[in-house]
Amino acid sequence: MPLHSKNAVRDDLLDDIYSSADLSLSMPKYKMPEQEHDPRHAYQVIHDELMMDGNSRQNLATFCQTWVEDEVHKLMDECIDKNMIDKDEYPQTAELESRCVHMLADLWNSPDAENTLGCSTTGSSEAAMLGGMALKWAWREKMKKLGKPTDKPNMICGPVQVCWHKFARYWDIELREIPMEGDRLIMTPEEVIKRCDENTIGVVPTLGVTFTCQYEPVKAVHEALDKLQEETGLDIPMHIDAASGGFLAPFCDPDLEWDFRLPRVKSINASGHKFGLSPLGVGWVIWRDASALHEDLIFNVNYLGGNMPTFALNFSRPGGQIVAQYYNFLRLGKEGYRKIHQACYDTAVYLSSEIEKLGMFEIIYDGKGGIPAMSWSLKEGVDPGFNLFDLSDRIRSRGWQIAAYAMPPKREDLVIMRILVRHGFSRDQADLLVADLKHCVEFFAKHPISHGSDELESSGFNHG
């Protein structure tokens, strides 16, 4: 009987991916392979490996957007090869960025929204640092004119996200972070004023504190700074870290005065990929007016074909996220943003009431007075057979990722779990989550933990 060898080309075209030669061995992981691989095979290996990631829609720890419309996917694909920094080559992408800047300036009540300055960034952390840099430069210029030293700048804030710690270290600024004490978990006017001096470059309230999700009292702090100036002459500006609240308060709490309606507010940063509803990779910083951004911070570059002003901590980046942000502004308008976020707030309040009914949890934040989220701790004196780190790990077996963490210094004794309610998290999903939490509680009642997990062992920690 004659033997017939397969045609190699036919073999490559017709063989099932998983019976192919490429997938008969493990592909290299830490060294670049010597030979090429079929694109279908390389894709399938990576696709299958990514299944090991968590389901982003069940990630209730992250602030970042995990659901976008099909049109956003299309626009992102159309912009995959556009470098937004090259404004001469892609002038219309630059125009869309400019429109977003002025829309946000208007949304945040800039007195000169048509002419003020602002820019997109990779996220709210970069935007926050740019706002902080502008504060430092303005303070330094003021001190030089007064003939005073400029070597000991400080900045005052409440419990902040790690980007501000990075900013303070990288730019050699003393960070006067107001610690949590007792039941006070955010900044207060009194705590701010006792830390102010002539070297304070600015006060940075957070509109949506990472740890508790509350809004800090921007207007009350502003009024306290007004009084301080009357009494001492110290004129201290404010930057608002509105990473979350900047895309929430204007739509769901429009009467709250936190933005450029307050004269001391010189700049605001926000995250487009959080409650701005855009895909990952876009933030915004807007200045009150052009005079609030020192001209020395702006670079003009011409090596991409045209002269372009730029203020950023990076350079090349994709334009798709900016285009997607503009799409959301057109697609949703103020009414659409309000409807989406109000639905999230309503679900957060509902979750709070349902989780409280379980009986062993103390609700720390119920979705009112901050961002659409909720958090809880174990009631004092209750021993349910688990701690919150154990619960975070157990609920993960059902796919849910819920942050569990101890509070910052002076309240490390308080451990909480936090849920972010984002666009795409429905009331039905909330019911499924509550049912799974009940099953976890019942499991621990039958199988109590004698030695509970700690924060390092738990997989449910996230402040991003």
Curated annotation (Swiss-Prot):
UniProt xrefs under InterPro entries: Glutamate_decarboxylase, PyrdxlP-dep_de-COase, PyrdxlP-dep_Trfase, PyrdxlP-dep_Trfase_major
Listed EC numbers: 4.1.1.15
Gene Ontology terms, MF aspect: glutamate decarboxylase activity; pyridoxal phosphate binding
Catalysed reaction equations from the record: L-glutamate + H(+) = 4-aminobutanoate + CO2
Keywords: Decarboxylase, Lyase, Pyridoxal phosphate
Lyase found in the keyword field: yes
N6-(pyridoxal phosphate)lysine PTM positions: K274
Function, as annotated: Catalyzes the pyridoxal-dependent decarboxylation of glutamate to produce 4-aminobutanoate. Has weak activity with aspartate, but cannot complement an E.coli panD deletion mutant.
Entries under NCBIfam families matching the protein: Glu-decarb-GAD
Family: Belongs to the group II decarboxylase family.
Protein name, entry field: Glutamate decarboxylase
